[in-house]
Design a protein with these regions (language model features):
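A non-catalytic, amphipathic alpha-helix used as a structural packing/dimerization or gating element
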Residues: 19-27, 174-185, 227, 248
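Catalytic subdomain that performs nucleotidyl-dependent activation
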Residues: 87, 118-129, 143-220
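Intrinsic disorder and flexible/low-complexity segments
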Residues: 232-278
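Helix N-cap / loop-to-helix initiation motif
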Residues: 49, 175, 189, 214, ...
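Short, amphipathic alpha-helical "recognition" segments used to contact nucleic acids or chromatin
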Residues: 218-229
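ATP-dependent adenylation/nucleotidyltransferase module used to activate substrates
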Residues: 2-158, 235
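A glycine-rich phosphate-binding loop feature that marks nucleotide/adenosyl-phosphate handling sites
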Residues: 43-46, 196-201, 270-271
Length: 278
């Protein structure tokens, strides 16, 4: 393997970007039509992923932006960026603060402190947003478009039945590196593209700080391992990643596979068939 193959493979040409653009837009239209719905709901966070999905969707279906900030954890500028994007795209949008809803859920378990269940508390916000997304979806006859990318899906960096609760993942096969390329190709504002990615789970939270690795390096590791089928030694030559970190990434991917899997169903027919053949 030549040094740099991982990064080179992640870079999309202009022709490839156009192909991705067309494929995603056609798929959005197809899913909306097959679902017999009128359009799509996108939860706009002011971040790059939701901005890209909204930009793509706005070109082909009736898109509606739902901006759901929690003042306790979201920066006001993010909501403003979401509003500015919706206006620039010419799509309808609504701002609904979810702080009181989140606080009411927290209050239902007053004996639990934040240190005891930090993850449980953090996951409440994406799950509240999922409820709001589907409330709007049911009211208006729209599908819910998710904003997760391939890096997040592989790493399990999303909330099960939260931001993972959607009808379609338009950019779910694009690594974060490619999301940035697509965003520039589609004209997403540079101030959105350049801001540190954050799930907005708490004040000052960023994806890269929480995962302990930069997206650029992480994408090289994931792309090299899963798309190119390279060994650790080959990936290490290209990225310089140490074996302990590589192993940690692979373990996280494995441990979070359940998040993207269909809930298991006990195969009763098989059990009864076996019983009757004895």
């Amino acid at each position: 393997m030549r040094t740099g193959e991982c990064m080179k493979g992640l870079e999309l040409s202009r022709e490839e970007l156009v192909e991705c653009e067309n494929a995603i837009e056609e798929s959005i239209v197809r899913v909306v039509e097959l679902s017999n719905q009128n359009g799509a709901v996108i939860a706009l966070s002011g971040g790059i992923d939701s901005s890209l999905v909204a930009t793509l969707a706005s070109r082909v279906v009736d898109a509606y932006g739902l901006i759901l900030p929690d003042p306790a954890s979201n920066e006001p500028q993010d909501a403003q960026d979401a509003v500015d994007l919706a206006k620039s795209l010419g799509i309808s949008y609504e701002i609904i603060e979810i702080g009181d809803i989140v606080a009411a859920i927290y209050a239902s378990r007053p004996k639990l402190g934040p240190k005891e269940c930090t993850l449980a508390y953090a996951n409440v916000k994406p799950r509240v947003r999922m409820i709001m997304n589907y409330f709007a979806s049911n009211l208006d006859g729209r599908i819910v478009l998710g904003t997760g990318n391939k890096t997040e899906l592989l790493m399990g960096y999303f909330t099960k039945y939260g931001d993972g609760g959607v009808d379609m993942l338009p950019i779910g096969d694009l690594y974060k590196t490619r999301v940035r390329q697509m965003a520039r190709h589609m004209g997403v504002p540079e101030n959105i593209i350049s801001k540190p990615p954050s799930a907005g789970l708490w004040k000052g939270q960023t994806d890269e700080r929480e995962m302990g690795i930069a997206y650029e390096t992480l994408d090289k590791v994931l792309y090299g391992s899963f798309d190119l089928g390279l060994s650790y030694g080959e990936v290490e030559k290209d990225t310089g990643i140490d074996e302990a970190t590589f192993t940690k990434i692979m373990e996280r991917v494995k441990n979070n596979e359940h998040k993207s899997a269909t809930p298991p169903i006990v195969d009763i027919d098989a059990v009864l068939t076996i019983r009757h053949t004895k």
